[in-house]
Amino acid sequence: MKRALRQTCYISIENNENIGYQLFNIAYLINILNKSTRNHIKRKIVFRKGNHIYSDSIFKGLFTVLDDDKYDNLGFEKMSINDIDIDIESLCSSTKNIEIYNTSADTRNPIVTFKYIDEPIKRRILELVYSNEDLMYSAYYMYRGILAFFGENTSDDDIAALHILKADSKDYDYYYDALSIMNDLKIQNIAVITDDIEWAKTILNDINDINDTSTYTLYYVSNAEKNNYETRFILMSMFKNLIVSNNASDMDSMWASYLSYYDNKKVITADKNIIHKYITDIL
C-alpha cells in the first residue's frame, strides 16, 4: 500500500532577470520536489510577485505567483542556498515552507551546474520553456526566415548562432577563435543574437576585415518583436550549432545549447566552470 502524501508544503527561490539563471533555479526546485515526493511530502513551487519570474510570457500560467500579503501569510523560513546544499536531504524531509536566497549570478553558486540535471528534469524544463505557443511560433518563423536568408538549400548543419552581449567580457578574440572553428567545419552562415545590433556590428564586422575576402555571412536577429528577449532565447535553442556568450552573468545561450534537440551539435564556450555534455569546445 502506498503511503499518502502529507500536507502541501511550499518552496520558493530568489531569482534574477536572466532566463538561464532562472532555469537553474527551477531545475533545482524540481530536484527538491522529486526528492520530497520520495519522502511522502507534497511540495509546490510559488513565487512572490516581482520576483522576476517571466509569468506573463515564457512561463505564462505555469507557476503560482502571489501578491506580498498572500505570499507572506504562508510563513516562509528563509534558508541560504549554501546551507541547503550541504544537507539537501534534511530540506527534502522537512514540512516547512522554505524560501531559498543567496542565489546570486555567480559560478560559486552551487545551483549553477548541470551535474544533477538528469533526463527527466531536462524533459520537464523543455516542457516549461516550449509551453507558450505564441512564443514558439514566433521563434520558429524567425528560424525559418534565417534559413531562407542564407539561401534556398541552407540546412540546419550550414548555420550557427552566435550570442554576443554588450556587457560581455572584452575578450573578443574568443568570438574570432570560435568562428574559426565553425569555418573549419565549413559553417560560414552566422545568425547573430545580441542585445545591441549596432554595437555588435562594430565588433563582428572586423572579423571579415581580417580576411582577404568576406569569409562569413552575418545575419542580425531583430530585437523589434514583442517579448523579443524570451523569443530570442527559444530561437537560440533551435540551432544545431551555437557559440555561447562569454558573459559570466548570462546563462541564456548555455541553456539554449543544452536544450537543443540535436544530438550531434557543435557548441563552443569560454566557460570552464559551467559545462554540459553537449559542449564540444572550451576556448
Outline where the language-model segments fall.
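Short His-Asn-centered micro-motif
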Residues: 13-15, 47-50, 163-164, 192-196, ...
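Secretory-pathway luminal glycosyltransferase catalytic domains
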Residues: 52-187
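Gly/Pro- and small hydrophobic-enriched strand-loop and loop-to-helix capping segments
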Residues: 35-49, 259-283
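Short, charged/polar "capping" segments at the starts of alpha-helices
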Residues: 51-56, 169-171, 197-203, 276-277
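Nucleotide-activated donor-dependent transferases that construct or modify glycoconjugates
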Residues: 2-17
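Histidine-anchored nucleotide/phosphate-binding helix
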Residues: 22-37, 174-183
